[in-house]
């Protein structure tokens, strides 16, 4: 199927493919993130603070606080994909200075001129339909328009199931090296 995209009002990217649309992530649609990611602050907090949030049950509040801070200090940091009104995937990205967990990877640090593709998720029923590619392309377009020189991501070479790290093979298919 052919797709084409246009940027609409309020930073909404409309992708014409079976009524799929991508909308900028905001506090208003934060609850549309998939459950594993909505209740995870693995990237957003350092490991100790993430465990503390998990133990206290404040994960959703911490996720909202992180998103609010990024939106206020830096601007748009993700997109949510929908088919009709149903959320089917998302992508998150931010400057590495706003992603505490990024510093804990052996291949850190992220280049100073790069933005970190934090994570992406596509509902299993949508795998192979181009949703993930559309999300990453929307992120890349947004970042290019903002003058970003590079996008970096951490990948999992042993990926077996959805997790906070994207499969390295998938990132490679999208052009990451």
What name fits each language-model region?
Residues 33-35, 79, 90-92, 120, ...:
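Ligand-binding pocket scaffold of soluble enzyme catalytic domains
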